[in-house]
Amino acid sequence: MDESHIRNFAIIAHIDHGKSTLADRLIEECNGLDEREMKDQVLDSMDIERERGITIKAQTVRLAYKAKDGQTYYLNLMDTPGHVDFSYEVSRSLAACEGSLLIVDSSQGVEAQTLANVYKAIDSNHEIIPVLNKIDLASSDPDKVKLQIEDMIGIDASESLLVSAKSGIGIQDVLEAIVSRLPAPSGKSENPLKAILVDTWYDTYLGIVILLRIKDGVIRKGMKIVMMSNNAVYQVDNVGIFTPHKKVVDQLSVGEIGFITASIKELSDCKVGDTITEEQRRCSEPLPGFRTIHPVVFCSIFPNEAGEFERLREALKKLQLNDASFTFEIEVSNALGYGFRCGFLGMLHLEVIQERLEREFNLDLTATAPGVIYQVTTRSGDVRKVHNPHDFGESQDIANIKEPWICATIMVPDQYLGVIMSLCNNKRGEKLDLSYSGNTALLKYRLPLSEVVFDFYDRIKSMSKGYASLDWEMDEYLDSEIAKLSILINSEPVDALACIIHKSKVEQRGREICLRLKDLIPRQQYKIAIQAAVGGRIVARETISPYRKDVTAKLYGGDVTRRMKLLEKQKKGKKRLRSIGNVNVPHNAFIQALKIID
């Protein structure tokens, strides 16, 4: 294929600005699917994406477009997620493309994630075409949004395209702009094969499928390929493209994006960002690859049935193949048994992974309280990264604790600025900058990550009636007053309920958990003490009263000493029972108690 007739582009935007709808219209215009197969969010293949109305996985499709110059061009479209938790998917898509369509809602204007994604595109040396969507809305104001793009992003918006993805207005102009304004890929077909591994996933029938972008050379069926990170050699079984259906082709050449299968059994051989080359003619050096993304939110996931542990392990492996930013390792809990400590990019990422495990693999799971990574320095001078309360150690052995802080960018209409700033201050935030573009405030705050990952995004949305937007990036580790809150039942610590929180919140959190457990744990024959402790200090306590058996019911008067003797005997029995008996805490009580921690 002549690479001058190929255009690789990503669609980037803030969440809900119409990326997937525009992708639908482009597919429709290029006759990628017939009318019977067309549906909304056609590239969002997971049920969870359709239900939530969001894109989670970046998707690709090749379209054939006959332009006004009479030539047929092949457009490789990559639809990307808009939520901050899935920004890694955006980065990978941009690495496979030469240009981007920047979609901005003409009624909402530039939002925080718009800025974050467009800066990624600029860093990738992309040609950017601004597209103002939803121009058919009464509240649309294209001129104001053009000024906002130039003012806040710093790119020329005078030739922005005006479209309505929903009604199909301006779609032809978008296709012509892609052909005329975006560059063709560079590279030479006669060079040794050099391809970047963009994504991987597991297919029940094909095994591991690899999505790749050819930078140099050609890949075809039967060719022996090498993964340059570990020199693993495989023979290509199939080569294909997405139209958006899978379509097998003879070969992929320079500039093309497609998939291969090669009977790959080892999940560890498929590293996203790896360079793939030919065994006979290896390329001289690998491609730069992608920046390594490290998880920032951690929680433990346990199967509710002990026999499901191996199924959970296999499910996690398959999901990790499809999502390189997700990590897991085995963990053992006294209360919940065998499970895994998992790492995520944010709370939405956590929710999506848990929901996919339950839906796609039919698993019944319990998740513990989410937490972040702390930097703990012991009195002996050792520095450890800790995200599991179990590894936190005793307070008397700790010299210093640092917690991760982030730099948050919040865009908010000025009438909601006051409540948003109050929220940031309540979350221990430090204001860095405040600027305006029209009646929109651009607010920059430094905040502890632990305060942001739980409910911060939801609260910003609710306080601003949905108009505020948030983007954030990791900043640095700073000294902090952090403590491990332990929950004890009859003086025995319950590891599954321990959490790491700021010292200012230990009493409130401890009281909430103790009260919840008091309602959930059934009464026993003896008194049960539920305590929340920091080190050796008890910060909250609740007591569950015992059942009382009336041992004096059979007495008919007589000497009072007989009555006292029976009561004393009962008291000793209960004391002995309390010292040797384990409190039977129902599994459901753990699940309900963990909800309060969330």
Swiss-Prot record:
Enzyme class, spelled out: hydrolase
Assigned keywords, A-Z: Cell inner membrane, Cell membrane, GTP-binding, Hydrolase, Membrane, Nucleotide-binding, Protein biosynthesis
Name of one Pfam family that matches: GTP_EFTU
Binding site for GTP: 16-21, 133-136
Topology class, membrane: Peripheral membrane protein
Predominant localisation class: membrane
Cellular component, GO annotation: plasma membrane
Listed EC numbers: 3.6.5.n1
Highest taxon in the source lineage: Bacteria
Compartment annotation: Cell inner membrane
Reaction(s) catalysed by this chain's protein: GTP + H2O = GDP + phosphate + H(+)
Record InterPro entries: EF-4 (IPR006297), EFG_II (IPR041095), EFG_III/V (IPR035647), EFG_V-like (IPR000640), EFTu-like_2 (IPR004161), G_TR_CS (IPR031157), LepA_C_sf (IPR038363), LepA_CTD (IPR013842)
Listed GO biological process terms: positive regulation of translation
tr-type G domain segment(s): 4-186
Gene Ontology MF terms: GTP binding; GTPase activity; guanosine tetraphosphate binding; ribosome binding; translation elongation factor activity
Family, as annotated: Belongs to the TRAFAC class translation factor GTPase superfamily. Classic translation factor GTPase family. LepA subfamily.
UniProt-listed PANTHER family: TRANSLATION FACTOR GUF1 HOMOLOG, CHLOROPLASTIC, TRANSLATION FACTOR GUF1-RELATED
Function of the protein: Required for accurate and efficient protein synthesis under certain stress conditions. May act as a fidelity factor of the translation reaction, by catalyzing a one-codon backward translocation of tRNAs on improperly translocated ribosomes. Back-translocation proceeds from a post-translocation (POST) complex to a pre-translocation (PRE) complex, thus giving elongation factor G a second chance to translocate the tRNAs correctly. Binds to ribosomes in a GTP-dependent manner.
Protein name: Elongation factor 4
Organism: Ehrlichia chaffeensis (strain ATCC CRL-10679 / Arkansas)
